[in-house]
Amino acid sequence: MMNTISFKIHVFSSLFFLALGSHAISHHDTKALIGKLTKRIDSGESTAENYYKRAIEYRVLGQIKEAENDLKMALERNVNFTAARREMTRILSKKGKYKLAILSAEKVIINALTKREKSSAMILLAEVLLNAGEPSEAIKYSSTAFKLNPNGKIEWYLLHARLLREIKQDDERPAILHTGYQTTGSIVLRNAWIDSLVECEQYETALPIIEKELLESRIKSSWRLRRAKVFIGTGKINAAMDDLRTCLKELDRRIYPKNPDMTLIADRGLVHALLGNIDTAKNDLAHLVQIGADEWITAPLEKAIDSIGNQ
């Protein structure tokens, strides 16, 4: 018995330090590649491609200013360098320079040579417009992208569904997400579809799927949270509270303080909000913001805190 326990501890420790080592090696490799590209550029190989490659590595390290400078150099050398223009658009949007980002995205559309390239550029502009607070304009471009490329991509469906929510057309979200799931087979889209069913109060469709997952899944917290929302929506408050408390215990076991999964923190915050622990939910939201979680992760929790806190 002791040998088995020792072996498990040894394996866990090995995997843990291997993960830490891989992270360190990854950053070391990125810095080494930046060094190589810098030598090439300084020795006369100051091509658009080398500046673009170095910009990508700077972005990986979170050195956005350096990445932006290199992208400018790449575009000075090749004004039609689409990949560099796309990256520049994203950086400008992230910095809140929306007018410049929109102009940059429009140039990507103009330079597109194929329907596939043009549809992808349309999605880029839709993302910028959403960030700029113009969802009604953004959805025109995401709709056009699907007309040009009906199969789309996973992130296109997620973006379009989010835009539908922003323009208060929630009831259309399940259909687009279900179409995306059927087209791509993506589990991400399947789960987003189920979430949209719950949010749109289509409980009779959502609950059997959730119950099946609870029977078959080893990790159950996200499914218990979904079922709790259904129970709340159908007035089964005691059953919802039981699910939420069980869900919270599982999440607390699965969240590692040194390297927490952002989506698990968001789920835990949502559970606390639904249990009425608003201050604790706010702490999880603040933690997510501090560690740089994207808006799609924080938005549902923020919405729940505002909604429940105002009741």
Annotate each PLM feature.
Residues 18-65, 69, 310:
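N-terminal leader/linker segments that initiate helical-solenoid repeat arrays
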Residues 40, 73-74, 107-111, 145, ...:
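Canonical positions in the second alpha-helix
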Residues 43, 77, 111-114, 148, ...:
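Structural marker of alpha-solenoid helical repeat scaffolds
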Residues 47, 81, 115-118, 152-153, ...:
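Residue-level recognition of tetratricopeptide repeat
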Residues 53, 87, 120-124, 158-159, ...:
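Canonical tetratricopeptide repeat
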Residues 60, 94-95, 131-132, 166-167, ...:
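Register position in tetratricopeptide repeats
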